[in-house]
Amino acid sequence: MVPFLRILGIETSCDETAAAVVERDAEGNARVLSDVVLSQLDEHSAYGGVVPEIAARAHVEALDELIEEALNRANVSLDEVDAIAATSGPGLIGGLLVGLMTGKAIARAAGKPLYAVNHLEGHALTARLTDGLAFPYLMLLVSGGHTQLILVRGVGEYQRWGTTIDDALGEAFDKTAKLLGLPYPGGPAVERMARDGNPDRFAFPRPLVGEARLDFSFSGLKTAVRQAAQDIAPISDQDVADICASFQKAISRTLKDRIGRGLQRFKTEFAATDEKPALVVAGGVAANLELRGTLQALCDKNGFRFIAPPLHLCTDNAVMIAWAGLERMATGAAPDPLDVQPRSRWPLDSNAETLIGFGKRGAKA
C-alpha cells in the first residue's frame, strides 16, 4: 500500500508564480493544504502579452515569499514535507529556471527528493484530484500556449491525438482581442463583448472541419477576423461585439467537429470499458462559458461525462504540479537527479509525430 505522502509544489512556467502543499493518503485521496498564486497581469498588460524577461524577474522577486506563505497556510514545515515538485517544462525558459533552481535548492538543503514535473502532465492529472477519475480518459487542453487532445492512459502514459498546427486557441483569442483594441488578457475580453454581439453576422472559417485527423488550426480564423475588421473600418463597439460573437461561434463549431470525432474514436478503442467515458477540459480558455456549453452538449449527446475542474485549477497553479508529483511517487517512480535541466519544449507524448511548421527546435509540446 502507498504510504501517506505530502509534497510542496512550485509552478513558474509562464506568468503566474505559484506554490502549494498537497497531501495524498494511502487510499489515493487528496487534500489541498495550501494554494498560493500570484498573477503577473499588471506587469504584462501594457504590452498586450507576456514578456519573458519581465516574467522571469517577477518570479525571482516573488517565489521565496510565496513558498513561505504556502508552508505557513498549510501549517507545516519543510521537515514535514516528503518531497518537492517543480515545473520543469514546457514554458518560458527564464521562468522555468527560477522555479526549478529554487526547487533544487530546497531539495538539497532539506534532504528531500525532487520531482521535475511536465506542466502538461499537471493539467492531465488534475481531474483525478478533483473528481477521482479513473484511467483512461480524454483531455482537451486549451490555453494560451497549447491546444491538444490527449488520451490519458495512466500516470506517465499519454497519447496525443490532436494538436494545433499553428496558433494555440488562447493565442488566437489574445491576438483577436489586441486587433480589436480590447484589453489583455484577450479571452475574457472577447467573451464579454460577444454577449452583446450577433454571432451570425460574419461567416468566419472553421479550419480542418470535416477532416479525419484530430488536429486544430486557428491562424486562418485570426486572419479572417483581421480582414473583416479592415473591411468595415472604422469599427464601432457593435461591430466589435459582432466580430467577437462570430469568432466564438466559429471556434465552437470547430471544437464540436474536432472533439466529436475524438469522442467517437475513444468509444471505438475502449468499447469494452464498463466505466462511463469522460472528457476533461483544462487550461485558461476552459473558462469560456460558450465553449463549455458546446463541450457539455457534445458529451451529453455522446454519452460522456464532462469534467471541468474549478477554474483556479484549470489555469496555471502549483496544486496540479504537487499532485502530479504525488501521482508519480505513488507509482514508485524514482525522483529526478538534482542536475535535471528545464525544457522549454517538452512534448507530453514523446512518440507523437512532429508537425510541419515547428522548425528545427521541434514541437513545444
UniProtKB/Swiss-Prot annotation:
Name the catalysed reactions: L-threonylcarbamoyladenylate + adenosine(37) in tRNA = N(6)-L-threonylcarbamoyladenosine(37) in tRNA + AMP + H(+)
Q: Which domain of life is it from?
A: Bacteria
Entry's InterPro entries?
ATPase_NBD (IPR043129), Gcp-like_dom (IPR000905), KAE1/TsaD (IPR017861), TsaD (IPR022450)
What's the short name of a Pfam family annotated to this entry?
Answer: TsaD
**Which SUPFAM superfamilies would you find in this protein's record?**
Actin-like ATPase domain
Ordered alphabetically, the record's keywords are: Acyltransferase, Cytoplasm, Iron, Metal-binding, Transferase, tRNA processing
Binding, substrate: 141-145, 174, 187, 288
Needs which cofactor?
Fe(2+)
**Enzyme Commission identifier(s):** 2.3.1.234
Compartment(s) where it occurs, according to its Swiss-Prot or TrEMBL record: Cytoplasm
Annotated GO biological process: tRNA threonylcarbamoyladenosine modification
- UniProt: Fe cation binding residues: 119, 123, 316
Quote the cellular component terms of the Gene Ontology held in the record: cytoplasm
In alphabetical order, the GO MF annotations are: iron ion binding; N(6)-L-threonylcarbamoyladenine synthase activity
Cofactor mode of binding and number, as noted:
Binds 1 Fe(2+) ion per subunit.
User: What is this protein for, i.e. what is its function?
Assistant: Required for the formation of a threonylcarbamoyl group on adenosine at position 37 (t(6)A37) in tRNAs that read codons beginning with adenine. Is involved in the transfer of the threonylcarbamoyl moiety of threonylcarbamoyl-AMP (TC-AMP) to the N6 group of A37, together with TsaE and TsaB. TsaD likely plays a direct catalytic role in this reaction.
What family is reported?
A: Belongs to the KAE1 / TsaD family.
Known PANTHER family for this protein?
TRNA N6-ADENOSINE THREONYLCARBAMOYLTRANSFERASE (PTHR11735), TRNA N6-ADENOSINE THREONYLCARBAMOYLTRANSFERASE, MITOCHONDRIAL (PTHR11735:SF6)
The protein depicted here goes by the name tRNA N6-adenosine threonylcarbamoyltransferase
Question: Taxonomy-wise, where does this protein's organism fall, top ranks first?
Answer: Bacteria, Pseudomonadati, Pseudomonadota, Alphaproteobacteria, Hyphomicrobiales
